[in-house]
Amino acid sequence: MAGHSKWANIKHRKERQDAKKGKIFTKLIRELTVAAKQGGGVPADNPRLRLAVDKALTANMTRDTIDRAIARGVGSNDADNMVELSYEGYAPSGVAIIVEAMTDNRNRTAAEVRHAFSKCGGNLGTDGSVAYMFERKGQISFAPGVDEEALMDAALEAGADDVVVNDDGSIDVFTTFADFISVNEALTAAGFKGDEAEVTMIPSTTATLDLETAQKVLKLIDMLEDLDDVQNVYSNADIPDDVMAQLG
């Protein structure tokens, strides 16, 4: 299957993400702590924690910081107060948005998310209003230059659902939610370590955006991502390459 990474193009402007590294670390530490609290502090026995550690290392978090976050989850009551919530709504032009948050104060988080939607011309919806448009899947991404045929063979052998070769030569391997850990580990064992591996929400249909709409939608997504309690933001926006280039 070929494509232009339409599912991944919302991960835009990597340099901006790098500039927010402190906030990214805060989100990663929270995930490490809660994962350790729920499933134990040994990554080998805790798939969620194992994935969180991999993501933290990919983000260049030090092993010492990772270990402290895990220890906090195992030995502290702080994580007991954290709950995982999701919000659903629409950005301008009816683009579907799902927000995943981790918080110790439901009211604060709900108010902040609602404010972001309202300020950016969107609408916060009810549970189920857009979730039916998405499917939770695993996504393992490889930069251009990987051996396409060998990776495809290894991915299908490992039980992947789909392998997408993007126009720029990068490759995305998609799995079911249940098979994500086993496929990712099988690929790593076969010599294919993804540049990024995560559980994500893949839209069943996408909305192609022009420049003006893309600017409005990304403004909302950026505002949501900047909220301390928000862990992930997903949308069904498909931003064409020429529009993405104009966004800078």
UniProtKB/Swiss-Prot annotation:
Main localisation: cytoplasm
InterPro entries to which the protein is assigned, alphabetical: Integrase-like_N (IPR017856), TACO1_YebC-like_2nd/3rd_dom (IPR048300), TACO1_YebC_N (IPR049083), Transcrip_reg_TACO1-like (IPR002876), Transcrip_reg_TACO1-like_dom3 (IPR026564), YebC-like (IPR029072)
Classification via Pfam families: TACO1_YebC_N, Transcrip_reg
Record's keyword terms, sorted: Cytoplasm, DNA-binding, Transcription, Transcription regulation
Cellular component, GO, one term: cytosol
Keyword Cytoplasm among UniProt keywords: yes
Compartments in which it is found: Cytoplasm
PANTHER family hit by this protein: TRANSCRIPTIONAL REGULATORY PROTEIN YEBC-RELATED (PTHR12532:SF6), TRANSLATIONAL ACTIVATOR OF CYTOCHROME C OXIDASE 1 (PTHR12532)
Protein name (database record): Probable transcriptional regulatory protein PSPA7_4544
Organism annotation: Pseudomonas paraeruginosa (strain DSM 24068 / PA7)
